[in-house]
Amino acid sequence: MVDKRESYTKEDLLASGRGELFGAKGPQLPAPNMLMMDRVIKMTETGGNYDKGYVEAELDINPDLWFFGCHFIGDPVMPGCLGLDAMWQLVGFYLGWLGGEGKGRALGVGEVKFTGQVLPTAKKVTYRIHFKRIVNRRLIMGLADGEVLVDDRLIYTANDLKVGLFQDTSAF
């Protein structure tokens, strides 16, 4: 039985990375340093732009985060690909929250636009995921649009984020 709360703490997310939140067959979030959120503040099966599900999560920003030390020296900025990966992480987390089983894999994205950046002076990144469709057949797949905000300002959008849950990834 999946623990279907509307919000999750950092410890809950770490438990997901250890395979403890959604059970042995459920999808896992990555462990630190690749876990790109500190908490999930809202998860619903309705709502969002398409009324088919919504997730909102946050990452606290501080200058000591690992990526600021190497991307780029003298010009620290959070890599845009980490924000994109966070959105994929949340799509997979939602599929597990719905009871889906399997190993999560990003399958693609239709379009990504960057209109801003995350600097070490920022306080918080917010991720918003708006589900468009859930396929629950042999392959469980989520299709969603996403937004990344820094200190409440929209800086990335992604259309048609796709994540699938696979029983066997050996041929993937």
UniProtKB/Swiss-Prot annotation:
Q: Which cysteines are joined by disulfide bonds?
A: none
UniProt protein name: 3-hydroxydecanoyl-[acyl-carrier-protein] dehydratase
What are the alphabetically sorted keywords of the record? Cytoplasm, Fatty acid biosynthesis, Fatty acid metabolism, Isomerase, Lipid biosynthesis, Lipid metabolism, Lyase
Q: Cellular component GO terms, alphabetically?
A: cytoplasm
One of the entry's Gene Ontology molecular-function terms is: trans-2-decenoyl-acyl-carrier-protein isomerase activity
Gene3D superfamilies given in the database record? Hotdog Thioesterase
Q: What does this protein do?
A: Necessary for the introduction of cis unsaturation into fatty acids. Catalyzes the dehydration of (3R)-3-hydroxydecanoyl-ACP to E-(2)-decenoyl-ACP and then its isomerization to Z-(3)-decenoyl-ACP. Can catalyze the dehydratase reaction for beta-hydroxyacyl-ACPs with saturated chain lengths up to 16:0, being most active on intermediate chain length.
E.C. designation(s): 4.2.1.59, 5.3.3.14
| One BP annotation, GO | unsaturated fatty acid biosynthetic process
Active site positions:
H71
Lipid metabolism among keywords? yes
Tell me, how does this one assemble?
Homodimer.
Q: Specify whether Nucleotidyltransferase is a keyword of the entry.
A: no
Which InterPro entries would you find in this protein's record? Answer: FabA, FabA_FabZ, HotDog_dom_sf
Family of this protein: Belongs to the thioester dehydratase family. FabA subfamily.
Catalyzed chemical reaction(s): a (3R)-hydroxyacyl-[ACP] = a (2E)-enoyl-[ACP] + H2O; (3R)-hydroxydecanoyl-[ACP] = (2E)-decenoyl-[ACP] + H2O; (2E)-decenoyl-[ACP] = (3Z)-decenoyl-[ACP]
For this protein, the parts annotated as crossing the membrane are none
Specify the pathway.
Lipid metabolism; fatty acid biosynthesis
Localization recorded for this chain is: Cytoplasm
The gene is fabA
Q: Predominant location of this chain?
A: cytoplasm
Q: Which domain of life is it from?
A: Bacteria
